[in-house]
């Protein structure tokens, strides 16, 4: 069954400064959308607001998941509803192993009595770790503690594959990765691709899109989505930069799809 994530006229402020000034965007399962734009245009603010970061105040608009306004839900309820955020800077949690964290997260999404048993969990974890070329000992390390930048990003994708959300928001998942790590991360995202999964990928660089072909590319500027198109739009940005995007501010569509 297909699902829809719809962002409608979203305005977001932090410390009384408005960052998002009316974002409109619709993503369906079966689609991967890329969001690009210069620094300071609100890309990461968008991901944080969708997931309910307490530092960001939504002053106007809605974020609808299958018609339900998730802005009225707590962070854990948003995750249970089917949202996942791969963070740019994942937190370290001392005393909680990677495996325990993921099993708890899986069971938190499930109804009582439907929890994943230990053998099912280990079988799936081993399979996904092998697919992502992750050392098995990482499962017993404390979450992100002492992980390299590349290990943290691979671990975010491992969590994505274990949790199988409806929608993932991938906030600069490619930042700081060498080419080998980028290929592994991209392989994991492409493996998730299908009719039951949708994603918003926030990135600065065309290089990620060389490995993950998006269905749509959106350009953010001045706190809004000002241009939408196909993969060719990202290539134009790489060749010409963002200066030409300023002209699009006069022609912003109210609901790019």
Specify the residue positions occupied by each region the protein language model found:
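Conserved structural motif at the start of ABC-family nucleotide-binding domains
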Residues: 5-7, 20
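The feature captures the beta-strand-to-loop junction immediately N-terminal to the Walker
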Residues: 36-38
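ABC ATPase NBD Q-loop/coupling interface
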Residues: 62-78, 144
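ABC-family P-loop ATPase nucleotide-binding domains
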Residues: 91-166
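Walker B catalytic motif
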Residues: 172-173, 180
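Conserved beta-strand-loop-alpha-helix hinge in the C-terminal portion
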Residues: 220, 224-247
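Conserved small/polar residues in nucleotide/adenosyl-binding loops
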Residues: 251-257
């Amino acid at each position: 069954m297909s699902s829809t994530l719809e962002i409608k006229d979203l305005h977001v402020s932090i410390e009384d400064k408005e960052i998002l000034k009316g974002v409109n965007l619709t993503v369906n399962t079966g689609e991967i959308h890329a969001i690009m734009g210069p620094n300071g245009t609100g890309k990461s603010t968008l991901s944080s607001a969708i997931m309910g970061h307490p530092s960001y105040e939504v002053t106007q608009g809605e974020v609808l998941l299958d018609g339900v306004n998730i802005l009225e839900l707590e962070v854990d309820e948003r995750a249970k509803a089917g949202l996942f955020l791969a963070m740019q800077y994942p937190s370290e949690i001392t005393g909680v192993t990677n495996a325990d964290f993921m099993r708890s997260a899986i069971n938190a999404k499930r109804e009582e009595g439907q929890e994943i048993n230990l053998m099912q969990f280990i079988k799936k974890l081993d399979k996904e770790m092998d697919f992502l070329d992750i050392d098995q000992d990482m499962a017993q390390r404390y979450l992100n503690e002492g992980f390299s930048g590349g290990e943290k990003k691979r671990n975010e994708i491992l969590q994505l594959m274990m949790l199988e959300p409806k929608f993932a928001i991938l906030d600069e998942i490619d930042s700081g990765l060498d080419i080998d790590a980028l290929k592994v991360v991209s392989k994991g995202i492409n493996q998730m691709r299908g009719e039951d999964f949708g994603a918003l990928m926030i990135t600065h660089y065309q290089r990620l899109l060389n490995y993950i072909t998006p269905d749509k590319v959106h350009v953010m500027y001045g706190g809004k989505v000002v241009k939408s198109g196909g993969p060719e739009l990202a290539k134009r940005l790489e060749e010409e930069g963002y200066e030409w995007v300023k002209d699009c501010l006069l022609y912003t569509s109210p609901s790019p799809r």
